[in-house]
Swiss-Prot record:
This is Beta-mannosyltransferase 7. It is a single-pass type II membrane protein. It comes from the Eukaryota. Keywords: Cell wall biogenesis/degradation, Glycoprotein, Glycosyltransferase, Membrane, Signal-anchor, Transferase, Transmembrane, Transmembrane helix. It is found in: Membrane. The keyword Cytoplasm does not apply. Its EC number is 2.4.1.-. GO terms for molecular function: mannosyltransferase activity. The keyword Membrane applies. The gene is BMT7.
Length: 651
């Protein structure tokens, strides 16, 4: 069975022409055949059964917008784009006070290239590489807050779900099939909250995954749904029925005489009410022999995309199982415009499972960032893609040698990657002093490593800080990528809930059992919700963001050295533990640490040749991080009272 998104199939218009010429008759016949094909094969992306979430305000226009309406839309677009960048900040002052931040050690392992001339495979193959601690480790203290939980009202979610008839009917069928005495609230799990800051609307836009599990076990999902909430700069959810006037892409309708022409797109506006469930269509079947259902969108990640029509909009990527494809694949979705695209490599088949693609927006070529989205397809070994947003087709920018086409390493997924917050609000005089090599871009994120049998339960998941370095060779017009720095496990001092499962007692009663280091032990980083500079210190004087605009023109600042620059930057990282919650931790001063990393600022480490990726030992920093992660796992298990088995672990 197919759950369908809202669609509008237009009838053939009455042209008033009774005697068509042969050429027009051919065009008309071809149009009818095309329309018949669309209708009969629309089980995947279109259909008459609406999910009821995206309202009819998204029309397909058969004519160009009239001049008056165009002026109104352009006025709205101008107003959105002209918000005060110097007085917009994603965090209230109370979340920026020093006394709420504690210190935690972050240890990253940097680029090993300078140490590979005398590379000794035997020496470096030891379990505890001396090079890790002696040469590659770069430790520092970073500031972070206690985690803040970001809840959702289950009854409110169910109210929205019940108004979307296909979703509601599917869940009711599942309830009738999976007989269970569990209370309804025990069957629903919300986690994987991924968020971005919408400065034009002064709110945080969060997508999270609501999972329905009839037996109350998080990793026995029947179906998942994507839920949108809005939060203010205090990270309080905005009231129910909050409405935004959002921009979207309006597409012209089919026309007899424009069948083979690209459809024209226009910017328009509509009202959108929150919270809401995204109307993602998906296949489902009940029952199936394997009893492995897992229908619907999973693991959403989000970033902000600059639409060529002149507005910024969220772009969500997720993986989803399809009955037609008989496998899990990746999709992109534009919620403002209700546009869903399957993502696929242009000249390669699907792998057995497509998931954990790490999205980022390349800032090297701003004109292309409007139409493409980049991904780390694989971290070990490193493979990078660029995908066209309109078609979903992906080109390989950097492809490593892989012995197994379907290989997926332990390091994968995590948050999206973001560029350093050195945007146009930072004075150009300051940016010019920073020691980043020419034609280099730096992206950072929090990946996560999946370790099996490392000491705590069956498997452990924790965040790992990473930097992705992008070097451009203007002679060959080619981009090169590398993992510049990577940390071992870093848990943000967050509370990690034990994995929960339903078990029977001696009398046959079902109860919930949750113990640390039993089953999975999970803390997943889901998004960098924001990253911005609140103030800058120069030679001991602090300048707030609203001062950046005229710091130098007003004569407040004279000459200065790069080592006199101190950024007070703030980053929000959203987390989920045990597939059952959403929280956020605020991090302060990370930018200063990053700007000291040798892999980012050393000109001798600029990549401009393929051989760099073929030198033995080029991935030593990643290996060091994996060793450190395993040591964390053992240490964590010991603290939980687990007796460590010294058998070899597998990743």
């Amino acid at each position: 069975m197919k759950l369908e998104m809202s669609s509008y199939l237009h009838k053939v218009p009455n042209t008033g022409i009774t005697n068509l010429s042969n050429s027009k008759s051919i065009v008309f016949i071809m149009f009818c055949a095309t329309l018949l094909f669309i209708i009969t094969s629309s089980r995947y992306l279109t259909g008459s059964e609406s999910l009821g979430q995206i309202p009819s305000e998204i029309p397909k226009s058969s004519e160009q917008l009239n001049e008056e309406l165009s002026q109104q839309i352009n006025s709205k677009l101008h107003k959105l784009a002209s918000f005060d960048k110097f007085n917009s900040f994603p965090l209230l002052n109370k979340h920026m006070k020093d006394d709420i931040y504690g210190l935690m050690t972050l240890e990253t392992f940097t680029d090993p290239l300078p140490y590979l001339e005398n590379y000794n495979e035997e020496e470096y193959s030891q379990q505890n590489y001396p090079i890790c601690s002696e040469k590659l480790m770069f430790p520092s203290k970073i500031k972070l807050t206690k985690q803040q939980y970001l809840p959702a009202d289950l009854q409110q979610f169910l109210g929205v779900l019940n108004n979307m008839r296909p979703y509601h009917d599917m869940v009711e069928k599942a309830k009738a099939y999976f007989i269970s005495d569990l209370r309804e609230e025990k069957k629903w799990f919300r986690f994987a909250g991924s968020s971005i800051w919408l400065p034009q609307f002064q709110c945080h836009y969060m997508v999270s995954r609501y999972l329905y599990s009839p037996n109350g076990v998080a990793n026995h999902a029947f179906a998942s749904f994507l839920y949108i909430q809005l939060f203010d700069s205090d990270w309080k959810e905005l009231p129910s029925h909050t409405t935004l006037d959002i921009p979207f892409e309006q597409t012209e309708a089919n026309s007899i005489f424009k069948i083979f022409k690209p459809k024209q797109k226009y910017a328009n506006f509509r009202n959108s009410t929150y919270p809401q469930i995204l109307p993602i269509p998906f296949d489902y079947k009940l029952p199936i022999e394997t009893k492995k259902y897992y229908y619907g969108p999973e693991d959403p990640r989000i970033l902000l995309r600059s639409n060529p029509l002149g507005f910024d909009e969220p772009l969500i990527v997720f993986n989803m199982k399809g009955l037609k494809l008989t496998k899990r694949v990746m999709y992109s979705y534009l919620p403002f415009s209700n546009t869903l695209k399957l993502l696929k490599k242009r000249r390669e088949p699907f792998a057995n499972i497509e998931k954990n693609w790490t999205p980022f927006k390349s800032v090297a070529q701003p004109s292309k960032t409007q139409t493409t989205i980049h991904f780390i397809y694989s971290m070990i070994p490193l493979e990078v893609l660029a995908c066209d947003i309109d078609s979903g087709l992906c080109d390989i920018l950097q492809k490593p040698a892989k012995h197994d086409f379907n290989y997926v390493g332990g390091l994968r997924g995590g948050t999206q990657l973001v560029s350093l917050p050195l945007n146009e609000t930072i004075p150009s005089e300051i940016r010019a002093k920073l020691p980043i090599p020419k034609n280099r871009q730096v992206y950072i994120g929090w990946a996560r490593t999946h370790l099996n049998n490392c000491g705590c339960g069956d498997s452990m998941y924790r965040p790992n800080f990473i930097t992705l370095v992008e070097d451009y060779d203007d002679v060959t017009d080619k981009y090169y990528y590398k993992i510049g720095d990577i940390s071992g496990y870093f848990d943000f001092a967050a509370k990690i809930e034990p994995w929960s499962k339903q078990v029977l007692d001696e009398e046959g009663n079902l109860y919930e059992k949750a113990e640390q280091c039993q089953g999975r032990n999970v803390l997943i980083p889901n998004s960098i919700a924001y990253w911005d500079v609140g103030s800058i210190k120069l030679a001991g004087t602090e300048y707030q963001k609203h001062d950046f605009k005229d710091m130098f023109s007003s004569g407040k600042v004279s000459d200065f050295n790069a080592n006199e620059i101190v950024f007070n930057d703030y980053m929000g990282v959203t987390l989920s533990s045990a597939d059952r919650d959403v929280s956020i931790v605020h991090v302060k001063g990370l930018l200063n640490y990053i700007l000291q990393l040798p892999s980012l600022v050393d000109d001798s480490l600029v990549i401009n040749k393929e051989w760099t990726f073929q030198k033995k030992g080029h991935d030593l920093n990643v290996r060091c991080a994996m060793i450190a992660s395993k040591e964390y796992c053992k240490s964590y298990a010991i603290k939980q009272g687990v007796k460590i088995d010294e058998k070899s672990e597998e990743t």
